Design a protein with these regions (language model features):
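A short alpha/beta connector and helix-capping loop motif
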Residues: 126-129, 165-204
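Active-site glycine- and acidic-residue-rich loops that bind
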Residues: 156-166
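N-terminal auxiliary segments of SAM/dcSAM-dependent transferases
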Residues: 2-39
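Rossmann-like AdoMet/SAM-dependent catalytic core
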Residues: 25-73, 80, 142, 190-304
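SAM cofactor-binding core of SAM-dependent methyltransferases
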Residues: 49-157, 184-187, 269-271, 275
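A structural signal for short, well-ordered beta-strand segments and their strand-loop junctions
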Residues: 81, 105, 156, 177-181, ...
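Hydrophobic packing residues within well-ordered alpha-helices of enzyme cores
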Residues: 116, 143, 166-170, 242
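Short, structured coil segments at secondary-structure junctions
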Residues: 98-99, 173-174, 226
Length: 304
């Protein structure tokens, strides 16, 4: 009897917490809507950090995306995002819920995707979630499975690994805005990326967790070849924004690699035992010095 009473009280507590969480989410959405309306007036900015705010994004991407939505014409209100985890803290979730865009998201974990498909917003909004480990061979077929039109509004690639190689291979969609994660530890002096490995895993590749992805200069060069202009980075120094050249205007403008580059301050490095080392600045590059990288200009494997 006592156990039954305890379980009943526990269920009541869980419901109260869930209700409080839902209420807090509504408040965040309302505040985000106000901030989005305010961004309509921001026609001249010095950097993307001027328009940043976060509701569901990990950093200031929610604000940047709303600013872009307010100042670029998007005929198709669709987005695609790779590497979304459980989607609670995601770059496109506010766009889904505030602007009612349609989305296609993928993650390598079936458990994460199950959490997404069991969520309330999966019922209330037009979102497709697929469990898949994305590589250069399957990315185009996976994108086609969304049944979206070729011109997609926003594409975000955040795979902590083969990001450069995946973006290079994509040809079945033509996004207006592309958000690419870059590794600022690699600097911008060399257009480099980790060599392609279909099974690349950031932690397995090197215990430090610092050896992954591509330099901003590599992504900048590839995007230019694909017809995109660089407009800046998040103030956190992890995501770079590119806009298709035909969509640039007197508000959304191209900037130089040097002007838009932001160095991250993340202290996420680890030792061989998996403990955080809190390495900062040049110490992070020193921890992975000598590891192989592919230079996209020389078509050669070099050392960091």
């Amino acid at each position: 009897m006592k156990i039954g009473c305890y379980l009943k009280r526990l269920r009541t507590v869980f419901r109260q917490v869930a209700n409080q969480s839902a209420t807090a989410e509504l408040h965040f959405l309302a505040l985000g809507k106000l901030l989005s309306e305010n961004s309509k007036n921001k026609r001249q900015i010095d950097s993307l950090s001027d328009v940043e705010f976060k509701v569901f994004s990990q950093w200031g991407d929610d604000g940047i995306i709303q600013w872009l939505v307010n100042h670029i014409d998007f005929p198709n209100k669709t987005f695609m995002e790779f590497g979304v985890s459980h989607y609670r803290e995601a770059t496109t979730r506010f766009l889904l819920m505030n602007n009612n865009w349609s989305g296609f998201v993928m993650d390598g974990s079936a458990a994460n995707v199950e959490k997404i498909t069991n969520s309330e917003y999966y019922t209330n909004y037009e979102l497709i979630a697929k469990a898949a480990f994305i590589d250069a061979d399957n990315v185009n077929s996976l994108l086609l499975s969304s049944n979206f039109e070729k011109e997609v509004g926003i594409l975000h690639i955040d795979l902590d690994g083969n990001d450069y190689w995946i973006w290079r291979k994509i040809e079945v969609v033509s996004p207006i805005v592309v958000i690419l994660e870059y590794n600022s530890v690699f600097g911008i002096d060399r257009p480099i990326t980790v060599p392609y490995d279909k099974t690349f895993d950031r932690t397995n590749a090197h215990f430090s967790n610092l050896y992954f992805g591509a330099s901003l200069s590599a992504l900048h060069q590839l995007s230019a070849e694909k017809g995109y202009s660089f407009i800046g980075c998040t103030s956190s120094g992890n995501n770079a924004y590119f806009v298709r050249n035909d969509k640039l205007n007197d508000v959304v403008k191209k900037t130089s690699l040097e002007n838009g580059y932001v160095v991250s301050k993340f202290r996420e490095g680890r030792d061989r035992n998996g403990n955080l080392t809190f390495l900062t600045g040049p110490e992070r590059l020193e921890a992975i010095k000598g590891l192989p990288v592919y230079n996209i200009n020389t078509d050669q494997i070099e050392k960091l």
